[in-house]
A protein has these predicted regions:
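C-terminal module of multi-pass small-molecule transporters
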Residues: 81, 92-102, 116-120, 138-139, ...
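Transmembrane core module of solute transporters
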Residues: 27-77, 182, 219-220, 233, ...
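Small-residue-rich packing faces within the transmembrane alpha-helices of Major Facilitator Superfamily
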Residues: 79, 106-107, 130, 191-198, ...
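Transmembrane alpha-helical cores of Major Facilitator Superfamily
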Residues: 36, 72, 76, 103, ...
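C-terminal membrane-cytosol helix-exit motif in multi-pass small-molecule transporters
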Residues: 192-209, 227-236, 255-269, 506-513
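Hydrophobic transmembrane architecture of multi-pass small-molecule transporters
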Residues: 10-13, 17, 196, 399, ...
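Cytosolic juxtamembrane N-terminal segment immediately preceding the first transmembrane helix
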Residues: 1-38
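Helix-loop-helix hairpins in multi-pass membrane proteins, especially solute transporters
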Residues: 87-220, 224, 237, 322, ...
Length: 546
C-alpha cells in the first residue's frame, strides 16, 4: 500500500491574469453549460431507447443491436479522437477547439433529429461524437487554466456536479418531450442550447495554449486514433455478438492493442511525445485512471438496462423513469462540489474507496430487484450510487489533472475522458452481452409456440419478446410473464458482475491512491498532487491566455 507522499508541491503562486481571475466563475458556468449539453443528450437517449425501438411513426423500429450502435457509434468516434482533440487544444488553442466541437455537436444533433432510419441515426450520432470529442477535454483544460491550483479541486467538484445536473435534467426533459413531441425532439432540443453556449463562449471564455508545444507528433496521433478505434470497435462488436472469441472480435481487439503498444513505445522514445508516458509510472496517477475506467465499466452497463427494467418490466413512462433516476443526479449535485472537504479531512484513498464501495453496493442491489420492489428502495439505491460517484470522480480527476503541467491540461483531460469512454464502452459491450446471452438462454424454452420466422427476434431482448407477443395477439399472452422473469434473471446476473467490477475498483484505489497527508491535507490537493505532479524544478511556465 502506498504511503503519503512528502514530495514538494509545485508552487501555487499567481499565474492567472487578474482580469481573467475575476471572471473565473462565469467562465466555469459556460464550461458547465457546454458539458451539460453533451451529457444531457446521452442521458436523454437512455430514456428514449424504448420509443426509438417502437415501429414508425412512434419510433424508427430500431433493433436491440441498432439501439446499442446508436450509443456506441458516438462512443467509438468520441474515444478514438480524444487524444487528438486534447493535443490540438494544447497547440491550437482550447477556445478554438471548444467552439469547433460545440458547433459540430449542434449540427449532428439537428441531423439526428431528422433521421429517417436507424442507420441514419447511427451515422449522425457519430457526428455528435466527433463534436463531443472536442468539447469535453477542452472544458476541463480551460478550467485548469483559469483557476489557481488551490481552487482547482473546488472548481473540478462543481464541474463534476454539472454531470449530475445533466443526469437529472436529461431524463426529465426527455420524458416531457417524448410525451408531447416526436422522438427526434430529444436531439433537436440541443440546438438552441448550443447557440447560447456559442455566444457565451465568444464573450467570456479566454483562449489558452501551450506556449512551447514543440512539433506535433503526427505518428503518435495516428497511432492513438487507429489503436483506440480498433480496440473500441472490437469491444462493441463482441458485445453485439455476445461472443468475444469470434474472429471479427478478436482481430480488431488484438490489432488495436498491438497498435497501442506501438504507440506507447513510440511515445517513450519521441523527443516531442503527444502523451508523456512517465506519468503512468506514478501509482497515484495510474490508480486514478484505472478507477475512472472501472467505475464507468460498471455503471454504463447498468444504466443501459435500467431503462428497460423501469419501462418494460415496471411499466413506467419515459418521464416517470426520468423522475425515478433523479436521486442519483441529486446526490451528485449535492456531494460532488463538497467532495474536496471530505478529501481534505480523510484523504483521497479513504474517500474514493468508500465511494467505490457505495457504487458497488448500489449495483449489487439490482440483483435483488423484482417486478414489485418498492419504489422507495429504488430511490435509496439510486441516491447511494450518486453519492458514491460524487466521492470518486472529483478526487480522481484532480489527481490526474494536477499531475500534468498546466500547459498540458488538454492532454490530461484527454487521458481522463479516454479511459472513461473505453471503460464505458467495455461496460455496455461486456455487461450487455452478459444480459442478452442470459436472457436468451432463459427465454428460449418458452418460444416453442412462436413462428420460426419470429423466434430469433423474440429472443433478442425483453422489448423484442413483448413486441412479438403483441403481434401474436391472444396466442402471445403466455410469453409476457416468462419475458419479465427472464429479464429479471438476466439483470440479476449482470448486476452481480457489475458489483464485482466496482469492488475491483475499490481494491485498486485502496492500494494505490495516496492517503491522508501529515498535517491534515487531503490526498488530492496535496499528497496526490505532490505524488504525481512535477516537482519544483519541473514547474511549468505560465500558459498563454487571452
Amino acid at each position: 500500500m502506498s504511503q503519503p507522499s512528502t514530495a514538494p508541491v509545485p508552487p501555487a503562486g499567481p499565474r492567472v491574469p487578474e482580469a481573467l481571475h475575476r471572471r473565473r466563475w462565469a467562465v466555469l458556468g459556460v464550461l458547465m453549460l457546454s458539458l451539460l449539453i453533451v451529457v444531457l443528450d446521452n442521458s436523454i437517449l437512455n430514456v428514449a431507447v424504448k420509443t426509438i425501438a417502437a415501429p414508425a411513426p412512434t419510433g424508427i423500429g430500431a433493433t436491440q443491436s441498432e439501439l446499442e450502435w446508436s450509443i456506441n457509434s458516438y462512443t467509438l468516434v468520441f474515444a478514438g479522437l480524444l487524444f487528438t482533440s486534447g493535443l490540438l487544444g494544447d497547440r491550437l488553442g482550447r477556445k478554438k477547439v471548444l467552439l469547433f466541437g460545440i458547433t459540430v455537436f449542434g449540427i449532428g444533433s439537428a441531423l439526428a433529429a431528422l433521421s429517417g432510419s436507424p442507420g441514419e441515426l447511427i451515422a449522425y450520432r457519430a457526428v455528435m461524437g466527433l463534436g463531443a470529442a472536442f468539447v469535453m477535454p477542452a472544458t476541463l483544460a480551460v478550467l485548469m487554466n483559469v483557476f489557481e491550483r488551490d481552487e482547482q479541486p473546488k472548481a473540478i467538484g462543481i464541474w463534476a456536479g454539472s454531470v449530475g445536473l445533466a443526469i437529472a435534467v436529461g431524463p426529465i426533459t426527455g420524458g416531457i418531450l417524448l410525451e408531447h413531441f416526436w422522438w427526434g425532439s430529444i436531439f433537436l432540443v440541443n440546438v438552441p442550447v448550443v447557440l447560447l453556449a456559442l455566444a457565451l463562449m465568444l464573450w467570456l471564455v479566454p483562449d489558452s495554449r501551450d506556449p512551447d508545444p514543440g512539433r506535433i507528433d503526427i505518428p503518435g496521433v495516428l497511432l492513438s486514433v487507429v489503436g483506440l478505434v480498433l480496440l473500441v470497435y472490437g469491444i462493441i462488436r463482441g458485445g453485439e455478438l455476445a461472443d468475444f472469441t469470434d474472429v471479427t472480435v478478436l482481430a480488431p481487439v488484438l490489432g488495436g492493442l498491438a497498435v497501442l503498444v506501438v504507440f506507447v513505445l513510440h511515445e517513450r522514445r519521441s523527443d516531442h511525445p503527444a502523451i508523456d508516458m512517465s506519468y503512468f509510472r506514478k501509482p497515484a496517477f495510474s490508480a486514478a485512471v484505472a478507477a475512472i475506467a472501472l467505475v464507468f465499466f460498471a455503471l454504463m452497463g447498468v444504466t443501459f438496462f435500467s431503462a428497460f427494467y423501469l419501462q418494460s418490466v415496471r411499466g413506467y413512462s419515459a418521464l416517470e423513469s426520468g423522475l425515478l433516476i433523479l436521486p442519483l443526479a441529486v446526490a451528485q449535485m449535492v456531494f460532488a462540489p463538497r467532495a474536496r472537504l471530505v478529501v481534505e479531512r480523510f484523504g483521497a484513498r479513504a474517500v474514493c474507496t468508500g465511494g467505490m464501495l457505495l457504487v458497488a453496493a448500489g449495483l449489487a442491489a439490482f440483483a435483488f430487484f423484482e417486478a414489485d420492489t418498492p419504489v422507495w428502495v429504488l430511490e435509496v439505491v439510486f441516491f447511494l450510487q450518486g453519492a458514491g460517484m460524487a466521492h470518486i470522480m472529483p478526487p480522481v480527476t484532480v489527481s490526474i489533472m494536477q499531475a500534468l503541467p498546466r500547459e498540458k491540461a488538454g492532454s490530461g483531460s484527454a487521458i481522463n475522458n479516454t479511459f472513461r469512454q473505453v471503460g464505458g464502452a467495455l461496460g455496455v459491450a461486456v455487461l450487455g452481452s452478459v444480459l442478452s446471452s442470459t436472457y436468451r438462454g432463459e427465454i428460449e424454452g418458452h418460444l416453442g409456440g412462436v413462428p420460426a420466422a419470429l423466434r430469433d427476434t423474440a429472443g433478442e431482448s425483453v422489448e423484442a419478446t413483448l413486441a412479438v407477443a403483441a403481434k401474436l395477439g391472444p396466442a402471445g399472452k403466455d410469453l409476457v410473464g416468462p419475458a419479465y422473469t427472464a429479464f429479471l434473471d438476466a439483470m440479476h446476473v449482470t448486476a452481480i458482475a457489475s458489483a464485482a467490477i466496482g469492488l475491483a475498483g475499490a481494491v485498486v484505489v485502496a492500494l494505490f491512491l495516496p492517503g491522508r497527508a501529515p498535517g491534515g491535507a487531503g490526498g488530492t490537493g496535496a499528497a496526490a498532487g505532490a505524488a504525481a505532479a512535477p516537482t519544483s524544478d519541473e514547474t511549468p511556465t505560465p500558459a498563454q491566455t487571452g
